C-alpha cells in the first residue's frame, strides 16, 4: 500500500529504479478496484511488487527508470461485468508470456466491497478458461463480451 503526496503524481512518473513494481498493478479503490492513472493526495493505493525496495513519488520529473505500462492483452477476448455503477473487464483467449502474467493480478477482496469481478485465481486474465468470482451489492448485473 502507498499513499499520495501533496500533489497528484502520474503512475508513469513514479520512480522505480529497482524495477520492483509489477507493471499494471497499481490500483485505487472507489467501491471497486480500478487501475490508477495517478496517485492522488491522501488516497491509498495497492500495488504488486516483485521484491522489497523503494519507489519515489515526486511532483517533479526524475531522470531514472519509471514505471512502464504495457498492454499485453491487446486483441484478446473480453468479458465486461457491470452493475450500472461499477464495472470490470476480464480478458481471455490470448497467450501472455509467463513473465508478464503478474501484470494482471488483482488486490485481495474484502467483505465491504460494493463490486468485484475476477477469475478465481485473483487475476483479470485467463488464457483459455477460468471460473469467475463476483461480488455485487446491486441487484443488477450486465455481461457484455467481445470475441
Spans of features found by a protein language model:
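N-terminal exported-region signature
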Residues: 1-147
Amino acid at each position: 500500500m502507498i499513499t499520495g503526496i501533496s500533489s497528484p503524481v502520474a503512475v508513469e512518473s513514479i520512480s522505480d529504479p529497482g524495477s520492483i513494481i509489477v507493471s499494471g498493478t497499481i490500483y485505487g479503490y472507489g467501491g471497486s478496484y480500478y487501475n490508477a492513472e495517478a496517485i492522488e493526495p491522501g488516497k491509498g493505493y495497492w500495488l504488486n511488487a516483485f521484491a522489497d525496495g523503494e519507489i519515489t513519488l515526486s511532483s517533479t520529473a526524475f531522470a531514472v527508470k519509471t514505471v512502464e505500462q504495457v498492454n499485453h492483452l491487446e486483441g484478446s477476448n473480453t468479458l465486461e461485468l457491470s452493475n450500472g455503477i461499477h464495472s470490470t473487464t476480464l480478458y481471455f483467449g490470448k497467450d501472455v508470456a509467463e513473465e508478464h502474467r503478474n501484470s494482471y493480478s488483482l488486490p485481495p477482496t474484502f467483505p465491504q466491497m460494493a463490486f468485484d469481478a475476477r477469475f478465481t485465481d485473483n487475476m483479470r486474465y485467463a488464457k483459455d478458461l477460468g471460473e469467475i468470482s463476483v461480488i455485487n451489492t446491486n441487484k443488477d448485473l450486465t455481461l457484455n463480451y467481445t470475441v
